[in-house]
């Protein structure tokens, strides 16, 4: 029997401990070899730049930072060390750069002469081998490219025929249509000669078909070019954008010697400071200003002006890149203030702008709105006094005033709007104190703006080209009175009365926009929505679809007052005020979306009985000066401010079934969407709380708590629940009935069997002329 071998556990334990110590020492040595340990003074610390909007840092100045190191804290205290890898240590040490700013050479320990011989020209054998291999690779690439070209040439069709040799200096394929366009674009711009504009701008104006300046342009452009601060007031659609856009571009052309764009060396030498800042109250107006100025610049030869638009709803990082080298900045106040706060050093550049333009100033400077405007104005007007300036002065010299220490930049302030008086911003509803004074008083408007803005001149030039009326001359204003529940019916009737007319419908709430858009779409009308709760891309998409030349000429845009200012869309013939505007200036800007320039347009108010007080105050504020004007304006006195629009009651009665069905369908769809969103919110809240949620049980308890529709909002909730209770089959039946009604023409008392017996023009029907919505003769609106 063999003897059993005994194991010594103590020896194995000792060997394992020794092995772990050896491995730890090896790892430590390898870690120390791969990293360098340095002290605090050896690192090249970088100064932390503080944000521009940080006024009071509470002592946190002179902060420095370093990246790419680890902190080593001694166990027994002592100096803190920093560890970094050898690949990164070269870039963070103080001596890693020489005096010239170039990286220092990598000094290595001398290890003697190598085995490789060196030629007389200092090229090693290893370098020669690398060059030889590189040449072989290039030869292979050349052969590959040649073979690919041969293959592509072989793939060409054989019946192409022999190639025609052409001169490299002559471009082929240019059609004569381009020459024809050049001839057609020639417009007589001799009317602009009195403004002394450059040849580049006159060429651009000719290509844009602007043959003569408008009154506001003729009055403002010379004053701005002379360096004056200007306050311009003109009716909507009078060309106020070019009144300040042309002088800004003219200044740019004069700065670069007649339109020459800055060279690359000039761009490197310059700090890329913006030249002009244009503030806009809405995103749509900002993008429209960008479009107009871009068209002006693109049609001017040899002119390269960089324009950046900063609005909400778009990428803030992209806007930061655009601001870095922008010449003209067009922005809404909120997003601009946000971007300025996230950038370093940009506020100091913004203080050096040459032009500050405030478009729609009455809205931007109104009390309680756009707080960021005041912050932006205070920031660019703030004067900083550096410590170096005080250090250079002797102690005997008195402290200088801020104006003496750093003189303000020669910035021009340009203010434009169609309404300036604060009385127009008072609410039309409710109890207000009515003052029977001149609502367009020049003195009050000047004092109001002088308190808000820091003009360079003591008294800026106030230019008012239409002191009597703020409305466009070719605008017709009408009024439709209706019952409280018939607004939808009269709106639909007005739209049918104006076929092939682009119509803009204004409401006072977002919920009304959503409901009317759904209602008109159910009535088979091309309708788009626009309100502030929409995403920015959706807003731009709605405006693009509504204003596109390829879209339906009967397109309808239902919008809140976000579209009331500055929106310049060609072809808008009708403005319908579904709700009476809250203020008189809003009515002016709403109606200004039509009858722009020399075109004509209509503006119609739909007035319910409870809105008559607001309409009376509106007429008193807007049209009061017409009665008090001089005898030379006798023609305007004969014109009734708001003409009554008489609609045919037969047509209204025949359209009522359509609108009733459309309202039922719309209310059902919106109620289902609302209940679904509320149910989703309650379900997610129940999951967060960890409780069970039953929608039917919750609805039953809620109805019991409300007391069967009693209390505030109880009746509305009961109607919504009833509308949402419609099944899919019932909803589909209502839609089928509505489609059948909409597919037919509205008969106004004509026999469909004997068309020739009445007043129907059969030839016009066959040609598609007249109003396709009606069957029979319909009188046009009298106003």
From Swiss-Prot:
Record domain Helicase ATP-binding: where: 221-438
One GO cellular component term: cytosol
SMART domains named in the record: DEXDc, HELICc
CDD domains: DEADc_DDX24 (cd17946), SF2_C_DEAD (cd18787)
Chain ranges for the short sequence motif Q motif as given in the UniProt record: 190-218
One Pfam family linked to the record: DEAD
Region annotated Disordered, chain positions: 1-32, 94-168, 388-410, 696-719
Presence of the UniProt keyword Signal in the record: no
Catalytic activity from the UniProt record: ATP + H2O = ADP + phosphate + H(+)
Domain Helicase C-terminal: 490-648
Similarity-based family: Belongs to the DEAD box helicase family. DDX24/MAK5 subfamily.
Keyword line: ATP-binding, Helicase, Hydrolase, Nucleotide-binding, Nucleus, Ribosome biogenesis, RNA-binding, rRNA processing
Function: ATP-binding RNA helicase involved in the biogenesis of 60S ribosomal subunits and is required for the normal formation of 25S and 5.8S rRNAs.
Protein localization: Nucleus, Nucleolus
Composition skew (Acidic residues), residue ranges: 105-121
Protein known as: ATP-dependent RNA helicase MAK5
């Amino acid at each position: 029997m063999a003897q059993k071998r005994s194991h010594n556990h103590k020896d194995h334990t000792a060997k394992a401990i020794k092995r772990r110590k050896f491995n730890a020492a090896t790892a430590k040595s390898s870690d120390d070899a791969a990293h360098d340990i340095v002290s605090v003074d050896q690192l090249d610390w970088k100064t932390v730049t503080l944000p521009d909007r940080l006024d009071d840092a509470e002592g946190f100045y002179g902060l420095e930072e370093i990246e790419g190191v680890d902190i080593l804290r001694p166990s027994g205290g002592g100096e803190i060390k920093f560890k970094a890898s050898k690949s990164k240590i070269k870039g963070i040490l103080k001596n890693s750069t020489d005096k010239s700013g170039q990286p220092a050479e990598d000094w290595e320990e001398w290890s003697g002469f190598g085995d490789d011989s060196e030629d007389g020209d200092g090229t090693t054998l290893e370098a020669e081998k690398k060059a030889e291999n590189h040449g072989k690779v290039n030869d292979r690439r050349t052969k590959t490219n040649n073979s690919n070209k041969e293959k592509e040439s072989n793939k060409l069709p054989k019946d192409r025929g022999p190639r025609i040799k052409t001169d490299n200096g002559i471009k082929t394929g240019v059609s004569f249509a381009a020459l024809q366009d050049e001839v057609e674009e020639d417009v007589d711009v001799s009317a602009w000669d009195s403004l002394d504009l450059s040849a580049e701008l006159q060429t651009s104006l000719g290509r844009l078909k602007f043959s003569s300046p408008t009154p506001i342009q003729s009055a403002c452009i010379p004053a701005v070019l002379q360096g004056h601060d200007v306050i311009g007031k003109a009716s909507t659609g009078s060309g106020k954008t070019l009144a300040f856009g042309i002088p800004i571009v003219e200044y740019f052309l004069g700065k670069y010697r007649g339109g020459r764009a800055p060279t690359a060396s000039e761009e490197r030498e310059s700090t890329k400071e913006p030249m002009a800042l244009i503030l806009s109250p809405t995103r749509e107006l900002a993008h429209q200003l960008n479009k107009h100025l871009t068209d002006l610049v693109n049609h001017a030869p040899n002119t390269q002006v960089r324009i950046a638009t900063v609005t909400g709803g778009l990428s803030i990082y992209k806007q930061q890149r655009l601001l870095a080298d922008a010449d003209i900045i067009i922005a809404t106040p909120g997003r601009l203030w946000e971007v300025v706060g996230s950038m370093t050093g940009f506020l100091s550049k913004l203080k050096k702008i040459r032009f500050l333009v405030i478009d729609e100033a009455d809205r931007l400077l109104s009390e309680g709105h756009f707080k960021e405007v005041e912050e932006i104005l205070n920031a660019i007007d703030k004067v900083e006094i550096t410590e170096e300036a005080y250090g250079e002065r002797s102690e005997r010299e008195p402290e200088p005033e801020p104006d003496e220490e750093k003189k303000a930049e020669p910035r021009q302030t340009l203010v434009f709007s169609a309404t300036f008086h604060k009385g127009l911003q008072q609410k039309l509803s409710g109890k207000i104190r009515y003052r029977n004074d001149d609502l367009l008083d020049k003195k009050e408007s000047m004092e109001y703006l002088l308190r808000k803005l820091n003009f360079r001149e003591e008294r800026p030039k106030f230019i008012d080209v239409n002191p009597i009326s703020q409305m466009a001359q070719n605008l017709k204003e009408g009024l439709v009175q209706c019952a409280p529940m018939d607004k939808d019916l009269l709106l639909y009737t007005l739209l049918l009365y104006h076929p092939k007319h682009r119509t803009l419908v204004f409401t006072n709430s977002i919920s009304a926009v959503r409901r009317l858009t759904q209602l008109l779409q159910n009535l088979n009308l091309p309708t788009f929505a626009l309100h502030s709760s929409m995403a920015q891309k959706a807003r731009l998409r709605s405006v693009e679809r509504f204003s596109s030349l390829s879209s339906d000429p009967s397109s309808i845009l239902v919008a809140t007052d976000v579209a009331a200012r500055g929106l310049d869309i060609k072809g808008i013939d009708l403005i319908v005020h579904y709700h009476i505007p809250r203020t008189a200036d809003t009515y002016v800007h709403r109606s200004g979306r039509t009858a722009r320039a020399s075109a004509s347009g209509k503006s119609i108010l739909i007035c319910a009985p409870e809105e008559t007080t607001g309409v009376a105050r509106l007429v008193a504020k807007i049209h009061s000066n017409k009665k008090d004007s001089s005898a030379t304006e006798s023609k305007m006195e004969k014109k009734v401010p708001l003409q009554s629009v008489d609609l045919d009651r037969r047509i209204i009665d025949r359209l009522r079934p359509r609108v009733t069905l459309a309202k039922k369908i719309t209310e059902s769809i919106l109620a289902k969407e609302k209940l679904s969103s509320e149910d989703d919110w309650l379900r997610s809240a129940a999951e967060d709380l960890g409780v069970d949620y039953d929608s039917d049980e919750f609805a039953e308890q809620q109805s019991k708590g409300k007391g069967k529709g009693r209390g505030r909002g109880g009746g509305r909730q009961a109607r919504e629940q009833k509308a949402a209770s419609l099944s899919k089959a019932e909803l589909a039946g209502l839609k089928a009935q509505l489609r059948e009604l909409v597919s037919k023409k509205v008969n106004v008392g004509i026999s469909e069997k004997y068309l020739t017996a009445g007043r129907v023009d059969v030839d016009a029907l066959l040609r598609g002329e007249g109003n396709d919505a009606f069957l029979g003769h319909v009188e046009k609106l009298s106003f």
